[in-house]
Design a protein with these regions (language model features):
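Generic hydrophobic/packing signal
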Residues: 78, 92-103, 111-113, 156-157
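A conserved beta-strand-loop-helix scaffold within acyl/acetyltransferase catalytic domains
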Residues: 2-68, 113-120, 124, 136-269
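Conserved GNAT acetyl-CoA-binding A-motif
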Residues: 100-113, 118, 285-296
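Flexible glycine-rich active-site/ligand-binding loops centered on an Asp-His dyad
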Residues: 74
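Aromatic (often tryptophan-rich) hydrophobic motifs at membrane interfaces
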Residues: 82, 89-98, 221-332
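Active-site/acyl-donor-binding loops of N-acyltransferases
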Residues: 35-36, 63-65, 114, 121-162, ...
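The substrate-binding groove and active-site-proximal loops of carbohydrate-active enzymes
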Residues: 77-83
Length: 359
């Protein structure tokens, strides 16, 4: 076997192709997703493991930088093809070696471990991980990069068609899906920059009205378009009388589709387009031959309750996050500064505003 680190596009393309059809894969380590952190001044790289010129594993790492502090973060993984789980320990050793090379004070990785049969192909179980990781602790001390911690699974069971599957949904869900289609929505897929920007405005508006944050379109645009152009995602748009009333952004990876974000126009009566958007994603998933759909973790209490209506099985990975402190002095200094800033947040915000005005 051969392993090497790379940022060359040819190898990044091969890495992405591997993740797309690898059950343990995640969109969080697609090269385009890793590149999106460059807008924050972060760097990235990919470790690839080859056997007879075939990619069988690796990991995607983000090198996060804050002042003079550096952190080496793997949002999901290491990832290996089934049958090569014994290589995980050696890949974890590579995380430490590589992080030290970059003078990082801290390294972190997140493994999808679960005993749930319903997602057994998408996860590792403890019997696959043959040894403990030396000098590695359970937990997550760096919280500025989203890392996988579970999967919110909509299983298609033995359904042979969307019609079979919808019959297993509750009466309420079936009714609301039918109500959404009664408004004769036009279902399209945003493809161009202009189409995506217009559709994404609804996501930004929902975030503003709901008092939560999403990345701006300008910040995420490059990632969006690259994923679309390489057929790794879907941006579903529902229009009524030519106006955008509902949107949903979904990424294809690991032999399933994951819901990333979406938005609907608030109308009276409710157009029920949230149900329609997810139903369209489920139909695409079934058409691709997938066995389930990841409606995604998290959200407000209302969003979580809405997702649960699709007969979800919310699976939290078992102690997913692991970390290594590589330079205790520097890392403790970082923690201290974080505490100081958190306790004096209003002061630092005012200071930042003053500096901007003076400029």
């Amino acid at each position: 076997m051969k392993l090497f680190f790379t940022k060359e596009q040819e190898w990044l393309d091969r890495w992405d192709a591997f993740l797309l059809t690898e059950n343990h894969g995640s969109h969080l380590i697609y090269s385009d997703w890793l590149k999106s952190y460059e807008s924050y001044g972060f760097d990235f790289e990919v470790l690839i493991v080859l056997k007879k010129d075939k990619v069988i594993g690796g990991f995607g790492a983000i090198i996060a930088k804050k002042l003079f502090f550096k952190f080496y973060i793997i949002p999901h993984g290491p990832v290996v093809t089934s049958g090569y789980e014994r290589q995980i320990s050696s890949l974890v050793a590579q995380i430490k070696i590589r992080a030290k090379k970059y003078n990082c004070c801290y390294a972190q990785f997140s493994l999808p471990i679960s005993q749930e049969k319903i997602v057994e192909k998408q996860v590792y179980n403890h019997s696959m991980i043959t040894s403990d990781f030396p000098e590695v602790f359970s937990g997550k001390k760096f919280k500025y990069i989203y890392c996988s911690y579970g999967i919110n699974w909509v299983s298609f069971y033995d359904s042979l068609s969307p019609h079979d599957f919808i019959e297993k949904m509750s009466v309420q869900v079936r009714r609301n899906i039918k109500l959404a289609y009664k408004n004769s929505p036009e279902i399209t897929f945003a493809k161009s920059d202009d189409e995506c920007e217009k559709a994404y405005k609804l996501i930004e508006e929902n975030a503003k009205n709901g008092n939560y944050s999403v990345r701006s379109y300008s910040d995420f645009k490059k990632t969006f378009l690259s994923l679309l152009n390489t057929d790794k995602c879907y941006f579903i748009v529902a229009k009524i009388n030519g106006e955008i009333k509902g949107v949903g952004f979904f990424v294809k990876c690991g032999n399933y589709i994951t819901y990333i974000s979406g938005g609907t126009s608030k109308e009276k009566p409710d157009l029920k387009l949230g149900y329609l958007i997810h139903w369209e994603a489920i139909k695409i998933s079934m058409r691709l031959g997938y066995v389930g759909y990841n409606i995604s973790m998290g959200g407000s209490p209302g969003v979580i309750a809405f997702k649960s209506k699709f007969n979800t099985k919310t699976i939290y990975f078992e102690e997913p996050h692991h970390f290594m402190i590589l330079n205790p002095f520097v890392f403790n200094l970082y923690k201290l500064l974080n505490i100081v800033v958190a306790k004096n947040k209003s002061y630092f915000n005012k200071l930042g505003s003053t500096i901007k005005i003076k400029k």
